[in-house]
Amino acid sequence: MTINYHKEIKTSHTWKFFVLLFRWKGSIWKAIYMETIIFLICYGIISVVYRTAMSEPSQRTFESVIRYCDKRLSFIPLEFVLGFFVTIVVDRWTKLWRTVGFIDDVCLLANLYVRGTSEKAIIYRRNIARYCALTQLLVFRDVSMRTRRRFPTMETVVAAGFMSKDELDLYNSYTTKNNSRLGKKYWIPANWALCMTYKARKDGYIESDYFKAQMEGEIRTWRTNIEWVCNYDWVPLPLMYPQLVCLAVNLYFLVSIIARQLVIEKHKMVDEVDVYFPVMTFLQFIFYMGWLKVIEVMLNPFGEDDDDFETNALIDRNITMGLKMVDNTMKTPELLKDQFFDEVLVSLLYSEESSQISNYHYHGSTSEVHLEQKCSSVRMIPHSQSEYTLKHMRKQTLSRSVLPDVNENERWKIPTSLEKF
């Protein structure tokens, strides 16, 4: 399920975000606790063996390995690999969320263009909304495990009321000669919805061909967005990229188990506190491994993690709200004057508590700048490189060269168009 924490961060106060660190569901602690335990156990075993079970020559040999690994640990470009990959994954996640679909536009247009209060008109509108919701459901069954568990068979879709038994028989009658994997029939409910608009227009429930075209365009847009969900599920990011990132992070900390071992004090020439717990390495593990877990969670938002998309809730919302929108809701309030009709300056009300909060209304950033008090003090002239000025100068030059008999006083006369300046 989606973990919503917006209520806890209504302000940017430090304490508000500090409290979020103690949340468990959907948290970084839940994501990395198993890896952290394994890392600390492995680190502790090697540390105990190094300090207690090795002879002094073996310790010195092991210390050489520690120094070798520590100096070359930075060869793994962890920040670059993680940063670039998380940018791609977040962009992909955002585009997927934009295409999962809310049915409101289709239903609002169906309610607007398919006119009538008769039972048949209502059935037309409800079928259009239901077929669009069915298109989304069929896609979600094949991309989301949560929806697949809810609707394991097409018979359960019928039992849930998204389609009738006759509609299922008609749906199953569309067969392909190819393998079933090449013949997914997501398009059938969308085609039914488009056919409903044609029949509604033919029966006179849609008043014009333009309204019919608008209705069909919105259904096509809905189907196209659902198709993008299929496309993203069909062609994920190249496998080698997640493999590379996962390999880089895990190898980095595998080497860190040795590279970050603290050398026994008596074997070193510099002073350093001998601690048994790798504090800074532990913090680094949390940040980098947590970064990797963020990528893994967002890579497939249709999975079953705490913060994956609520596909079942979206299906429920679309079918219930969609049917409600088209179910004879064309009645509008009586045409009345609003309470501000005769007021020149509208005075709006606030609750007593919120009335004390100051509002910042938009003003242009330079709208309050006053450069000159009087208009007469501003002299307006053409730009020095304007096209008009250049053409005028060329014309004057040509006149002086071609008409040598022009009166000397007229030759240098200021053009009338510029006298006002």
From Swiss-Prot:
The keyword Transmembrane helix applies. One of its GO terms (molecular function) is chloride channel activity. It is a multi-pass membrane protein. One of its GO terms (cellular component) is chloride channel complex. It is found in: Cell membrane. The keyword Transferase does not apply. Its main location: membrane. Pfam families: Bestrophin (PF01062). The chain crosses the membrane at residues 28-48, 73-93, 239-259, 275-295. Keywords: Cell membrane, Chloride, Chloride channel, Ion channel, Ion transport, Membrane, Transmembrane, Transmembrane helix, Transport. Belongs to the anion channel-forming bestrophin (TC 1.A.46) family. Calcium-sensitive chloride channel subfamily. Forms oligomers. Forms chloride channels. This is Bestrophin homolog 2. It comes from Caenorhabditis elegans.
